[in-house]
Amino acid sequence: MTAANQNYGTGRRKSSSARVFIKPGNGKITINQRSLEVYFGRETSRMIVRQPLELVELTDKLDLYITVKGGGISGQAGAIRHGITRALMEYDESLRPALRAAGFVTRDARRVERKKVGLHKARRRPQYSKR
């Protein structure tokens, strides 16, 4: 892929990271050499990926080439959305306020809380017995 007339954005969510390249085209989305429909079986994940493009009404004007690794389905979808948002802002800075208002620009910093010693999970304590 040539560097001319393409824009790039990196997105992260949980333990997933996505590299997104956008260039003028007809709306084809390729994720790890597979189509969006093949890569994400769940409609919810596909919808999350499409959100920034639908917001700025560029769904059928740009082609997306995406590589994503790490994490699960939900984290990868969120990372791709974040990457698409950053690439769109590089493509056209005037899109930033609309994307910001929708909450796509902000990186979701929530992570899995670590398990603590003496507890069953991160916060789940053993049952308390008074007697």
UniProtKB/Swiss-Prot annotation:
Pfam family, one: Ribosomal_S9
Keyword list, A-Z: Ribonucleoprotein, Ribosomal protein
InterPro entries cross-referenced by the UniProt entry: Ribosomal_Su5_D2-typ_SF, Ribosomal_uS9, Ribosomal_uS9_bac/plastid, Ribosomal_uS9_CS, Ribsml_uS5_D2-typ_fold_subgr
Gene Ontology cellular-component annotations: cytosolic small ribosomal subunit
Claim: Transferase is one of the keywords in the record: no
BP terms from Gene Ontology: translation
GO molecular function per UniProt: RNA binding; structural constituent of ribosome
Family: Belongs to the universal ribosomal protein uS9 family.
Record protein name field: Small ribosomal subunit protein uS9
Species: Actinobacillus succinogenes (strain ATCC 55618 / DSM 22257 / CCUG 43843 / 130Z)
Lineage: Bacteria, Pseudomonadati, Pseudomonadota, Gammaproteobacteria, Pasteurellales
